[in-house]
Amino acid sequence: MASLYSQGFELYPTPLHMENYILETMHSNVLYFLVEKYGKIVSLASAEMDPKNRNAEITDCLTIPSERGKGHMKELIRALEKELSERSFLTFYTLCRASAPGINAAFSSLGYAFTGRLVNNCRIGNGFEDMNIWCRML
């Protein structure tokens, strides 16, 4: 997972390129789900959980270029939502790159409401990027 994240994101707000970081978060408040094809990870996403307030951020979404447009991310988001709802979570949200139409389309098609844009909010890749906020309540 760390290797795929390091290939997919040149810069990222959290150290997903470090295996120890991923393992540490797995044992705290983060769920990681993935799609494999022929024994290789082709898509992955996570949910950072806030159990006290029963909300979770769907984040760290990545699909390798050759597998984009095949519905993997929507499958992962649905699976994360199912797991979270079984744990009594009521609200899901995400901040995703405004410049990435695929991930925005995925959240929109799954019934998330666009609630705004944070301008120059997150340092990913070559600089600061605008981030769209999407929310869904059960």
Q: Where are the model-predicted features located?
A:
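A conserved beta-strand-loop-helix scaffold within acyl/acetyltransferase catalytic domains
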Residues: S6-P65
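Short hydrophobic/aromatic beta-strand or adjacent loop that forms the aromatic wall/cage
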Residues: V30, E129-I133
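Conserved acetyl-CoA-binding loop-helix of GNAT-fold acetyltransferases
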Residues: T63, G69-L84, A105, S109
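Conserved GNAT acetyl-CoA-binding A-motif
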Residues: L84-R97
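Conserved catalytic-core motifs of GNAT/GCN5-like acyltransferases
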Residues: Y93, A113-F128
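Conserved beta-strand-loop-alpha-helix junction that forms the acyl-donor binding cleft
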Residues: T94-N104, N121-C122
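Short beta-strand-to-coil "C-cap" segments at the C-terminal boundary of structured domains/repeats
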Residues: C135-L138
